[in-house]
Regions:
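Catalytic strand-loop segment that frames the active site of acyl-thioester-processing enzymes
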Residues: 1-47
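HotDog/MaoC-like acyl-thioester-processing domains
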Residues: 1-7, 83-133
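Generic detection of short hydrophobic beta-strand segments and adjacent strand-loop junctions
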Residues: 8-14, 77, 125-127
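Short amphipathic alpha-helical segments
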Residues: 20, 55-56
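Secondary-structure boundary/capping positions in well-ordered alpha/beta enzyme cores
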Residues: 29, 68-69, 118
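Short, conserved phosphate/pyrophosphate- and ester-handling motifs at nucleotide-, phospho-/glycolipid
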Residues: 51
Length: 133
């Protein structure tokens, strides 16, 4: 069983293919994500990844950090900076609360741009951890 303060970081590089597949699966073809000519005309100057694509990395990181048979009970997210295609993101999970008797954990979730440390997505997740074996 992990203790409060336990933290793990994962590195993920966002690719154009990831953004395209996310658009296809969700139907979110907002041109800021998939149309480079349109994106050049925006304040960002280039395509940005879907915020929820980055949020989805938290789900993967929670499984890798706390075990594959745990259950995701909730997640809140704030999108604080754009993530661009080609950015490498550091996805960090930190256990900040734990109800051991119920195996319920509260996890701080943060996605930072590796190149400059900008926090791009942050929030908290509540998970039911897998029982120890």
């Amino acid at each position: 069983m992990h203790e409060i303060g336990y933290s793990k970081t994962y590195e993920i590089t966002v690719t154009k293919d990831m953004v395209q597949k996310y658009a296809e699966v969700t139907g979110d073809f907002n041109p800021i994500h998939v149309d480079e000519d349109f994106a050049k005309s925006t304040k960002f100057g280039k395509c940005i990844a879907h915020g929820m694509l980055i949020g989805g990395f938290f789900s993967r990181a929670l499984v890798d950090t706390f075990g594959g048979s745990g259950i995701y009970l909730g997640q809140d997210l704030k999108f604080t900076n754009p993530v661009f295609v080609g950015d490498t993101i550091l996805v960090q999970m930190t256990l900040i609360g734990l109800r051991k008797e119920k195996l319920i954990g509260t996890v701080e979730t943060t996605a930072k741009r590796k190149s400059n440390g900008d926090v791009c997505v942050k929030g908290q997740a509540v998970i039911m951890m897998a029982p120890p074996r």
